[in-house]
Regions:
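Conserved beta-propeller blade signature
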Residues: 19-23, 101-103, 169-170, 221-225
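Long, well-ordered mid-to-C-terminal structural blocks that present hydrophobic/aromatic surfaces
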Residues: 99-178
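Beta-propeller fold detector
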Residues: 1-7, 52-55, 69-80, 130-150, ...
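Loop/turn-rich, solvent-exposed surfaces of beta-rich toroidal or solenoidal domains
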Residues: 153-230
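Short, conserved, GDST-rich strand-edge loop motifs in beta-rich repeat architectures
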Residues: 23-55, 104-123, 171-182
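Long, acidic/polar, low-complexity amphipathic helices and coiled-coil-like
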Residues: 1-92, 96
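Beta-propeller blade signature
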Residues: 1, 37-68, 118-134, 183-194, ...
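Repeated scaffold domains used in trafficking and secretory/extracellular systems
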Residues: 5-17, 81-94, 146-164, 205-217
Length: 231
């Protein structure tokens, strides 16, 4: 899935259909950096356009086979880009399930962007791709879309996701402060549900971190290592 990286220096200089800098959207020209600056994950170079120009769309590139010689790009305006982010880290949000669908999740991280043109108006949500379709018909399922919400009805905000088995995907979700808070909750998304996330209960109250990947055993149960402030 396309991540929210905007345009590199190479992308900026491209001529498209006779238009110089053709990948820069009209009215977005001032977002192109005129000098290098920033630091850490916010570092940038002159002639780069940081972050996406299409916050209300999700684009996915699909390669036909392992030769990577033929591909197609599909897009949807039901969700924002399918990528979790924390500083310089970008996290997977596409998972193939046992039912043959690829589920594409968006935490709508673009809500945190400073410029309104790069902020999404879309809530966190899920769409899917039917991998059993022919190459010509491979696209987003027009009949499947879920808005992701917490059990109390508030919009979900999450950092990471992992496919477990069956209909279940586990999310590392933020507390009630959303993206301004701490990702210290585990919740379960059932692909056949209405999008209401189920809280994982019984976790320690002083969790300070989670392992990067859960272990899925032969019965389909997920085991997650946690660290706590009390040791």
């Amino acid at each position: 899935a396309a991540v929210p990286m905007g345009l590199s220096q190479w992308g900026y200089i491209q001529t498209v259909n006779g238009k110089e800098h053709g990948y820069v959207r009209e009215g977005y020209e001032d977002l192109v950096k005129t000098e290098s600056g920033g630091s850490g994950s916010g570092k940038y170079n002159a002639n780069e356009l940081q972050w996406t120009q299409y916050p209300d769309e999700c684009w996915v590139a699909i390669f036909k086979d392992e030769t990577l010689e033929e591909h197609k790009v599909i897009k949807t305006d039901k969700i924002s880009y399918a990528c979790g982010r924390n500083r310089s880290q970008y996290y997977q949000m596409l998972w193939k399930a046992d039912d043959g669908y690829i589920y594409v999740l968006s935490p709508s991280y673009a809500k945190t962007m400073k410029d309104s043109r790069q902020q999404t108006t879309l809530p966190a949500g899920v769409v899917r791709i039917n991998t059993n379709a022919s190459w010509e018909n491979l696209d987003f399922d027009p009949n499947y879309y879920k808005t992701l919400k917490n059990a109390n009805g508030t919009e979900a905000a999450f950092l990471r996701s992992w496919y477990i088995s069956g209909n279940y995907i586990m999310l590392l979700a933020y507390d009630e402060q959303g993206f301004d808070g701490t990702a210290n909750r585990l919740v379960i998304f059932d692909t056949q549900s209405d999008g209401i996330l189920k809280e994982v209960t019984g976790l320690p109250s002083d969790i300070s971190g989670f392992s990067s990947t859960p272990y899925i055993d032969e019965t389909g149960k997920a085991h997650m290592v946690v660290s706590t402030e009390s040791g």
